[in-house]
């Protein structure tokens, strides 16, 4: 245990009992090394057993139980974290097409709570789907993510870019998000595969807005450029958490500063791009750390930020440290807007791609309407 600002701090990060040690805002290097060494290893995430997946109430279970004033222990899932069962014609059509084309979505693989809402948008032009490229197996083992992990995933499907573009054209969506697993085993980390998919979508369905949620390409900025110049509208890369918690949350090959460089470089080579990132809350971060993170993102010209509640996917992953209330999410939305972000989506169930089309389009239309009104005066 250590003291920070007069209080004892011993924040437990993983269910396995790893602690994040801090001394007056800085990590103690030796204790950080010990904590990382004793935590889940890359091999612990290889070929995850689906039977370990948690129920929603378990996924949001707190690391430490909250004792209420009457002495009872709080374990019930807050009402704002409950969602409806996915239904709807558009939802079923997208799901069936995915099966027929052997495509994957991060919506399903990451067990997103908003799948039915996004896929079943009020009309096709408002519906959003997030296609996961390069298979369903990642070469990294982040401590928050439920995607399968392997040192040597299966080879890429050379027909995937064409099949993806055809599916998007068939669905008639207004907005599509492309994400991918990390493929550190490939010479270009999959950059050419992602870029080809984007180009084909724009060729087959030029009306579709395309967002790409990319890996960090191990910091190779030439690969970042290749994707950024491929015709997409939104370049997204997630920092996931505050800098102080990054070593505990993300794979050890990921780096907060590296992620900032990726986002800034994408904007520098394609100034028209909207750049976007996402932050999970409830991992044990402090308000000061969130504030500093937002400042760094703006310094690196990031346009859009989203905030959502961390959800634990399996028992091998980190436990939730805190339920962040809707009021607190609203606080961070307002604060981010004050700092100059073009758009902010903030809420307990928001994910990096949550109803991206609706948020993006609504914001752009609002700006155009305001500009027209000003011109008329």
From Swiss-Prot:
GO terms for biological process: lipoate biosynthetic process. [4Fe-4S] cluster 1 binds at residues 107, 112, 118, 353. Residues 123-342 form the Radical SAM core domain. GO terms for cellular component: mitochondrion. CDD domains: Radical_SAM. [4Fe-4S] cluster 2 binds at residues 138, 142, 145. PROSITE patterns: RADICAL_SAM. It comes from the Eukaryota. InterPro entries: Aldolase_TIM (IPR013785), Elp3/MiaA/NifB-like_rSAM (IPR006638), LIAS_N (IPR031691), Lipoyl_synth (IPR003698), rSAM (IPR007197). Pathway: Protein modification; protein lipoylation via endogenous pathway; protein N(6)-(lipoyl)lysine from octanoyl-[acyl-carrier-protein]: step 2/2. Its EC number is 2.8.1.8. Its cofactor is [4Fe-4S] cluster. GO terms for molecular function: 4 iron, 4 sulfur cluster binding; lipoate synthase activity; metal ion binding. The keyword Transport does not apply. SUPFAM superfamilies: Radical SAM enzymes. SMART domains: Elp3. It catalyses: [[Fe-S] cluster scaffold protein carrying a second [4Fe-4S](2+) cluster] + N(6)-octanoyl-L-lysyl-[protein] + 2 oxidized [2Fe-2S]-[ferredoxin] + 2 S-adenosyl-L-methionine + 4 H(+) = [[Fe-S] cluster scaffold protein] + N(6)-[(R)-dihydrolipoyl]-L-lysyl-[protein] + 4 Fe(3+) + 2 hydrogen sulfide + 2 5'-deoxyadenosine + 2 L-methionine + 2 reduced [2Fe-2S]-[ferredoxin]. It is found in: Mitochondrion. The keyword Iron applies. Binds 2 [4Fe-4S] clusters per subunit. One cluster is coordinated with 3 cysteines and an exchangeable S-adenosyl-L-methionine. Residues 1-77 form a transit peptide. Its main location: mitochondrion. Belongs to the radical SAM superfamily. Lipoyl synthase family. NCBIfam families: lipA, PRK05481.1, PRK12928.1. This is Lipoyl synthase, mitochondrial. It comes from Schizosaccharomyces japonicus (strain yFS275 / FY16936) (Fission yeast).
